[in-house]
């Protein structure tokens, strides 16, 4: 008897009261057996209360409450641990603001069967960011190019947060070494997946601007990612940059 695979979508939230219920409704409408874990950082706008109500009313909706705003990276790491403890096979990352179209979700399971990490990519052929201004495109594209160049990464969209991990890879990545608040966390995750010999597969997505609410992007998050890439590049150089951690982790 073939064991049914279990998939969990982790959605970190901070002040997403207007977006959360429409997003959950859209995901469940796919009828694809996705479960959802909302990780809420004590949102002042009542997002956590909405999440609790949804978990009572709907099957497969789980909620983790944290005491305050602790950042994207730690939300995902706590969510990953929660998922591993409960035996999920495939674990997704997804923004709550509809910049990640739920319609792409069914594509991930078709790719993850032959990969360790699948990324919905803005920077492979067919991917796009249609509503972005020049400055935002420059920062995002430049940040990706910088990370790929400095760290020798093969993935095109190293900062994108629409992802699916295979559980076995989640268990190998040293998450405690990626203590970052913003999208630098995503760069660190790709770095370790590739260094561990994992297979990364990308497919094109159209990345939309958030529908409602405030963007979480800040200059501090950009600088955090920049500093992280420099630090890891220097670390690679120091140990001879063999582009693999397998010998170190076995």
Feature locations, PLM:
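N-proximal low-complexity "stem/linker" segments adjacent to membrane-targeting elements
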Residues: 1-26
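Hydrophobic helical membrane-anchoring modules
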Residues: 1-7, 145, 150-153, 175-250
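Short beta-strand/loop segment that forms part of the nucleotide-sugar
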Residues: 11, 34-43, 64-65, 94
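Acidic helix N-cap motif at the loop->helix transition within catalytic regions
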Residues: 18-22, 45-54
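Short, acidic, metal-binding catalytic loop of nucleotide-sugar glycosyltransferases
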Residues: 25-34
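A conserved acidic beta->alpha catalytic loop
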Residues: 40-49, 98
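Acceptor/aglycone-binding surface of glycosyltransferases and processive sugar-polymer synthases
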Residues: 62-85, 90, 102-183, 210-225
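Short glycine/serine/threonine-enriched helix-capping/active-site loop
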Residues: 93, 119-121, 203-205
């Amino acid at each position: 008897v073939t064991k049914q695979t279990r998939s969990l979508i982790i959605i970190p939230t901070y002040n997403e009261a207007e977006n959360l219920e429409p997003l959950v409704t859209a995901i469940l409408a796919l009828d694809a057996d996705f479960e959802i874990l909302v990780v809420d950082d004590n949102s002042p706008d009542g997002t956590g209360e909405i999440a609790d109500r949804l978990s009572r009313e709907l099957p497969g909706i789980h909620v983790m409450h944290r005491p305050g705003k602790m950042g994207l990276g730690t939300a995902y790491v706590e969510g990953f641990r929660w998922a591993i403890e409960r035996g999920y096979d495939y674990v997704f990352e997804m923004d709550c603001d509809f910049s990640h179209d739920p319609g792409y979700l069914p594509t991930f399971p078709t790719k993850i069967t032959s990969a360790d990490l699948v990324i919905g990519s803005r920077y492979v052929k067919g991917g796009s960011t249609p509503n972005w201004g020049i400055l935002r495109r420059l920062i995002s594209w430049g940040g990706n190019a910088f990370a790929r160049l400095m760290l020798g990464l093969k993935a095109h969209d190293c900062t994108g947060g629409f992802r699916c991990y295979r559980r076995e890879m989640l268990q190998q990545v040293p998450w405690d070494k990626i203590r970052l608040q913003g999208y630098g966390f995503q760069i660190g995750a790709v770095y370790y997946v590739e260094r561990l010999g994992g297979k990364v597969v990308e497919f094109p997505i159209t990345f939309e601007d958030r529908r409602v609410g405030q963007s979480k992007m800040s200059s501090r998050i950009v600088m955090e990612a920049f500093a992280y890439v420099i630090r890891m590049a220097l670390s690679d150089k120091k140990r001879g940059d063999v582009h693999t951690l397998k010998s170190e982790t076995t």
